[in-house]
């Protein structure tokens, strides 16, 4: 009889823990949903706290266009090839004037308008930290195109992330960007498993490198980082579309925020099909990050 009572007590304790946790997450969800009210956009959110194990998701069934957020999984696929010995950080790649496509975001093109030779490490740095489109396509060519990235994701059981087109293809046709999509929780899972290095996804050198260049991201200062204290550590990757007929297909930021108490917030925010201004789209993301920061810091 005592054993039965103990089992019942354990089950009751577990039940109330789950109810309490869900109630807490629901409270955060309500705060975020207040930000989303009356916004003329489809907004997807996934948040996971490393200590609390709370999971929050909003509009998770929608396929959000990633734009340059895709450079994070592309970089992981390249690093995987480096770890296998098929490529190396020091390997030099010639970039010709023909590679420097017009009308695309590229610090490489700005710095080396006549072409140059860079190491794979340097190209990865440009591609992730500075979101270089030309660097992205060069890396894709090195590993065999988008199919290789998809195979990497599938082999490591990352579902609900699709990468079918490179930057050049996306720039030629507005609708092509929708072939590169993710759900918020799928992107968050990629962040979490990479950060935890689940199943030794990367070697130590590659692991340290990807998080270094994610922390050094120069784009999107008004998004996840926008309203956080100045010295907050945020390792993140942004994604931004153009505007067509008054609609911005994608204003995104995904990453890992480190709280002063050491807790980690894994967060993915996608703002799609927005008729709002670029400033409002970015503020949606920074508002969500700030609310989440305050919520977990003051629990």
Curated annotation (Swiss-Prot):
Amino acids binding a beta-lactam: 71, 131, 167
E.C. code: 3.5.2.6
Catalyses which reaction(s): a beta-lactam + H2O = a substituted beta-amino acid
Inhibition and activation profile: Inhibited by the beta-lactamase-blocking agent clavulanic acid.
GO annotation, biological process: beta-lactam antibiotic catabolic process; response to antibiotic
SUPFAM superfamilies associated with the record: beta-lactamase/transpeptidase-like
EC class (word): hydrolase
Matching Pfam families: Beta-lactamase2
Protein name (record): Beta-lactamase VEB-1
Organism: Pseudomonas aeruginosa
């Amino acid at each position: 009889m005592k054993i039965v009572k103990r089992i019942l007590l354990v089950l009751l304790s577990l039940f109330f823990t789950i109810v309490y946790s869900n109630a807490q997450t629901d409270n955060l969800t309500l705060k975020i949903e207040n930000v989303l009210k009356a916004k003329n956009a489809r907004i997807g959110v996934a948040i996971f706290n490393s200590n609390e194990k709370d999971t929050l998701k909003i509009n998770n069934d929608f396929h959000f266009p990633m734009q340059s957020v895709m450079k994070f999984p592309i970089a992981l696929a390249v690093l995987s090839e480096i770890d296998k010995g098929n490529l190396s950080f020091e390997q030099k790649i010639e970039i010709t004037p023909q590679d420097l496509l017009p009308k695309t975001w590229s610090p490489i093109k700005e710095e080396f308008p006549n072409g140059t030779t860079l190491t794979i490490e340097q190209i990865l740095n440009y591609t992730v930290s500075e979101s270089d489109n030309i660097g992205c396509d060069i890396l894709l060519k090195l590993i065999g195109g988008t199919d290789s990235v998809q195979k990497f994701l599938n082999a490591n059981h990352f579902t609900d992330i699709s990468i079918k087109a490179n930057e050049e293809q996306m720039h030629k046709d507005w609708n092509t960007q929708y072939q590169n999509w993710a759900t918020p929780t799928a992107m968050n899972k990629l962040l979490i498993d990479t950060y935890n290095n689940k199943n030794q996804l990367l070697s130590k050198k590659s692991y340290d490198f990807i998080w270094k260049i994610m922390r050094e991201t120069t784009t999107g200062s008004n998004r996840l980082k926008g309203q956080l204290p100045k010295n907050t550590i945020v390792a993140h990757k942004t994604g931004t579309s153009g505007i067509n007929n008054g609609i911005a297909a994608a204003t995104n930021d995904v990453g890992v925020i480190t709280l002063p108490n050491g807790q980690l917030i894994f967060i993915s925010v996608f703002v799609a099909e927005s008729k709002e201004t670029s400033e409002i789209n970015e503020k949606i993301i920074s508002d969500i990050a700030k609310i989440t920061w305050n919520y977990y810091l003051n629990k």
